[in-house]
């Protein structure tokens, strides 16, 4: 693949709304050829919307989007838009639409060459064939299928049959299939929405190496902080309907945000101090005026009386000036740095049976997916479960949650369990955020709204939004809110960082440090794993291969 010096992306005055909700307003930005940019922001801020605009999947309501990429565009959405009856080959063809179109045009041109009745028709067909062949070779179309196999192997899906139905694949397998096919199409411009979701360590490492060697432009939405550090030089933050650009990668973004917050705090502190000083000045001089008699007898009109009246006029002037400054400062307030939506709840621990284990497994077998001879989890123990995709991690959590009965063995979990699943709950699209949160929960509507708002995960107006209007990250917040709003003795977290913003992941980590019950964590987030303190269990092909 060759990159074009004219390849670029730009937005000029772009506004995008859904019904009456404005997601992006007057956004302008440019991305240079060969640039590797990460898009971050709060859940629902408009990250995926921005990527869809760049991919041409949606059109702006105002403004202009320009994408010049003669070498093609590869777009990876968060979900594969094909029905369960579709095949693996259908998914590959969808990701390689541009190449498949070129192949079809080549076949039509070959037919035109064979059927040309005149020299002029033959020359036209030869010219078209040469042009199409050059385009196809630039994309290395002849090696595309081999690249699919290589990418599937790198992402942990070797030998996937092309005729296999998508409905027989897990959500993670479908995501990796779509990613492999998108990369194999070898476009000049890659637009990737959460590409590291559902990838184990080996697959993420392969992806980082592949994208680092990509000679074109990469724009990716991701919550993976290590991935941002290693791949991107530019960070685009979507916030408050706008997009801001930061250099020096994710570390540079964090430093810039911290400096900006300090600057805003200093400006607010200075404004507040000046306002308070002038209010005190006005009040002090009013009190001084009150101490000077308004009327004096004739005997008082001496030298001292003129000094008193002079002080009187001076105090009045100071009061007037101070009041004017207070009015100006009040009319032009300086806002303090905004507090981001964050997880403010403390995850409560349910009362359990004293020092009894939170969970015990003995001789557990689940088909060919899981074999656990013995596992004991203390009342306040923390356990990190790792292993490649398909190792049985989610199966083990489902057994601990009581959602999956083993074929053999005994399971004892005496306390209350909270389970954050990897797969999202299929809430009806017409439910509001508040209705989804309150589903099967005691308490009236106002009480549920207060509980929801106290968690800090949604603004008040967001409680009225329909589930169908939410981003993946916002729907994940519903699950997180339901989890942390009830006390539990055993907390099971299956890929809790999926679809959450980096800032919220930090808040979740902080909330977990204050949780006093037993915790079992499955995560591909390398930074979360590096900060984890507790026991470690490794699974491979459903069998415990290591523990410490």
Curated annotation (Swiss-Prot):
CDD domains listed in its UniProt record: ABCF_EF-3
GO biological process assignments: response to antibiotic
Keywords: Antibiotic resistance, ATP-binding, Cell membrane, Membrane, Nucleotide-binding, Repeat, Transport
Record PROSITE patterns: ABC_TRANSPORTER_1, ABC_TRANSPORTER_2
GO cellular component, one term: plasma membrane
Superkingdom as given in the UniProt entry: Bacteria
InterPro entries: AAA+_ATPase (IPR003593), ABC_transporter-like_ATP-bd (IPR003439), ABC_transporter-like_CS (IPR017871), ABCF_ATPase (IPR051309), P-loop_NTPase (IPR027417)
Protein family according to the UniProt entry: Belongs to the ABC transporter superfamily.
Protein's UniProt name: Tylosin resistance ATP-binding protein TlrC
Species whose genome carries this gene: Streptomyces fradiae (Streptomyces roseoflavus)
Organism lineage: Bacteria, Bacillati, Actinomycetota, Actinomycetes, Kitasatosporales
Gene: tlrC
